[in-house]
């Protein structure tokens, strides 16, 4: 989507994009948890979901969380689509958590691709800054801005990259995830060259892997640097693979730390056996480790993006 010179918009100092070139590596989960983490620290936080996938880690759609803005619905990406198509400020759902506002993604975001391509024929490459323009009126209100991006489409990924200051790149250890980073590397270079020279790769990291597989991790780090560059920072924290607590938390629309808080009053396996509770009522003890891993990863991301405490 990039080819010509554009009038630049300086991205907010406090903006971080979570991006990669392949789905299924934890990108949306990481973005939601990073935003929730900074909000829990008392920082006014905005999460912008520039993806057509219906990710709902925060329970916005399923549980109706947050205060909807006046007017038409903004869920399923409808609000983001209208802001871009009407060239108007973003309309987030307020207080999805204390201090956390969210511009949800969803199906309507995918419809932006055709709109952007149509506008590019008459307006040129400047359309890649459409999100940056819609964000600009709101940005001063927030201490932290997090972008979840779309690995399924270059145009959408570039839209988020053009509005962000920092890029962090998650990956799994498999070859397809590593090779998928070539897409984000290509989009990063294009956006930085022609639309957002302030964009920086803050680092990359492994997600949902065995923390004790250190030999394999060393190999993966080399693979990452081959794709993103030898100078790429690789974060030390590896969030372990714990599928059951992660799945349970997401079904309840809870962040890992929130789900972990339910453990002391959780039903136990013997309650299920006695018919006093359902399996879904039992909070797995593994959520403690998962919550701690995610907290440590969030702190490392913020440290390398100049926002650590």
Question: What function would you assign to each model-found segment?
Answer:
Residues 1-309:
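P-loop NTP-binding core
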